[in-house]
Amino acid sequence: MRIVIFRLQANPIFEERRLTVKKWTWGLLTVFILVWLAVGGTGDRSEKDVCDIGGDPFESCTSILVGKLASADGSTMTSHSCDSTTDRTWITVVPHKTHKPGDLCPVYRNSKETRIPDDQSRFKSGDIPQVPETYAYINTAYPCLNEHQLAVGETTFGGKRELRSKEGIIDCPELYRLVLERAKTAREAIRIADELTKTYGYNDYGECFTFADPQETWHFEIVGPGAGKKGAVWAAVRIPDDHVGVSANASRIRQLKLKDPDRFLASANVHAVAQEMDWWDPSGDEPFEFCYAYGSRRSMGSRRREWRVLSRIAPSLNLDANAENFPLSVKAEKKLTVKDVLDIFRDTYQDTPFDMTRTVTEVSREGKASVSPVASPFMNREWMALLKVQSERTICCKAATYLQITQSRSWLPDPIGGLVWLGYDNPATTPHTPFYCGIKRMPASYMVDGRTRFQRDSAWWAFRTVSQLALFRWQPMSQTIARVWSAIEDKAFADQAKIEEEALALYKQNPAKAAEFLTSYCVKMAEDAVAAYWKLHDDLWGSYTYYF
């Protein structure tokens, strides 16, 4: 008996098709999904395979910057959706340390893919002189927040391959670590990044760092100096206080007004390297534009995310979804909360022509069409080919290792004013809980890496298993899951003011007691979320067993 008809189209601009599916096909599709999950659906694939749609392997992160006058409470915010299938899942708190004269600081390569904090498989690139003291920081795969409320997000844009140099010893994650250990403000971080890369060399791809301190937010881009050279080329633009900016794996900085150092900064060689490479002629008609000199604007997967973020922040601009360039930042038409930023990171182009679920429909016996229960914005390539769906690189990515959204607040003491809202795996299926920059430890399950094998004691797997189960029958299961994550987040947001009031009272009496109070709160909040998700995992198997 025929029970389902799919109405399929790749996009509104594509021809509509109809596909009749017999009842037994559901069984075959279920087997297909089980096999897919077993051989690679849980993440053992390249970033390009999972996230990329535009032919650029660097479509794997998104970062949003919020100025203090663009936020609802005066916070500055930065963020990073670490959309990678290889980066480590263990997270620790590295304490404040003092060092002796003559001490050296080891520099490692690719520390973001280690499996334990002291992984001996790390390749040591070299040593640099240590500073007298290094600041405490929350050590995510790309370290995110230090004890002075300096926060940083990241996206890779690659840059031109001729810029890569093997002469340097500092890669992107290590540069993150070094500036968070040594800087108190975004401007100081940029200065230190310049000094370190100038002296010891930068050896990684083109990267964007999105810095936030309690007063300012900065968009910083860096590339190598060219083969055989030691150094780096970089530029930075301050995001206006009432603006929101975005980076999505494409270079964004265009013209530099270096006579205005309050808003624009750059390396001393920013023009010279482009001239040497014949990428810019100062005597020509075209102005120098950093993104075209050292990168490109080809990736539609990047541009589409830029369009969507900025359109949600300033809808009255009516930005063209297919434009090559967008403003680096826009004035917020509504002041944003952390919850608002989270909602953007969960965006899958819903209610737009680029929503991948809108063309996968089923038709009942009565002839009524509706979205199919299996329609998902996170279908793999095989599913999209089968259902003739045009792939889009959405803001929300099923390959995420974690999403961080930081708050830095000038009116509170640093240990209370700085915090990161952190959630593992797909933002669409995961709750995000707070971790203050003054805490002393992470939950035990957050310090267990989950990349090499399934481990019940790894927090990452609690959220990963739920997000992967949801792909079987996305429409109903995602709603079930949303009820759980929204309850956890709503409680965290509702309790925030009270928790911080108690912490502030303790801080005035004894800062150490305030730190332990916040540590206990953050650890319990996270552990409760992990426990809730293991229960949800078990409940989903029972509730949807007929469909597996």
What are these regions (language model features)?
Residues 3-20:
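Short, Lys/Arg-enriched N-terminal segments with co-localized hydrophobic residues
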Residues 485-548:
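Histidine-centered catalytic/metal-binding microenvironments
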Residues 34-49:
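Bacterial Sec-dependent signal peptides at the C-terminal "C-region" and cleavage site
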Residues 371-500:
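Substrate-recognition/cap regions that form aromatic- and gly/pro-loop-enriched pockets
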Residues 48-172, 192-339:
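A contiguous strand-loop segment
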Residues 275-416:
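Glycine-rich, aromatic-lined ligand/substrate-binding cores of catalytic
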Residues 176-182:
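Short, well-ordered beta-strand elements within core beta-sheets of diverse protein domains
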